[in-house]
């Protein structure tokens, strides 16, 4: 369901609100706290925020339909194909920035990105590492990724998460993806 409020895509603001919730639990951490490992593959807080930032950037440049997306996708595939880890590739994009500076860079970018997605045609097809998807699905996927990776941060900090109604975007994309898996595999 595409929700347009005041000619803007609501899913973009739901993404931003999810990011803001994550930012609020991290904004008072010290530099060394970002090296704390999570239960997800031992990723540190730096790894998680760097991952979210890099793939937000990827989704955002896919809106432009230009060479920037192609160059990014080719770089990612080349790095991962040559044995680099996901985190190693992502650190080349974030230029090794860590801690509160990385958190600030992530927030500034997702805030600006929200506005670009909010005014984009929700049905426009954008590139991704797999099949193309709609703008609405792209920003919903970024929301889902943020929500999912945030859980490892909440768990590591010993915090209980309070989910908001915006979780419906994640439920919808999960349901659509589930059906899509059967379609792709012809089952």
Give each language-model segment a name:
Residues 1-13, 64-77, 95-100, 104, ...:
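Structured surface interface patches that mediate subunit assembly and partner/cofactor docking
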Residues 23-44, 65, 69, 115-133:
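Helix-loop segments that flank and shape redox-cofactor active sites
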Residues 15-22, 45-59, 79-93, 99, ...:
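Alpha-helical transition-metal enzyme core signature, strongest for iron centers
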């Amino acid at each position: 369901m595409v929700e347009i409020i005041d000619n803007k895509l609501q899913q973009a603001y739901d993404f931003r609100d999810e990011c803001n919730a994550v930012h609020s639990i991290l904004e008072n951490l010290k530099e060394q706290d970002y090296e704390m490992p999570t239960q997800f593959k031992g990723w540190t807080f730096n790894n998680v925020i760097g991952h979210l930032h890099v793939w937000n950037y990827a989704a955002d440049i896919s809106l432009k339909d230009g060479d920037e997306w192609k160059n990014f996708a080719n770089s990612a595939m080349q790095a991962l194909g040559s044995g680099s880890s996901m985190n190693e590739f992502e650190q080349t994009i974030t230029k090794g920035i860590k801690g509160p500076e990385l958190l600030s860079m992530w927030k500034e970018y997702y805030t600006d990105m929200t506005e670009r997605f909010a005014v984009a045609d929700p049905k426009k097809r954008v590139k991704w590492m797999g099949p193309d998807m709609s703008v609405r699905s792209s920003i919903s996927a970024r929301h889902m990724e943020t929500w999912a990776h945030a859980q490892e941060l909440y768990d590591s900090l010993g915090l209980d998460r309070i989910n908001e109604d915006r979780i419906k975007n994640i439920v919808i994309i999960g349901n659509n993806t589930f059906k899509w898996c059967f379609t792709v595999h012809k089952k």
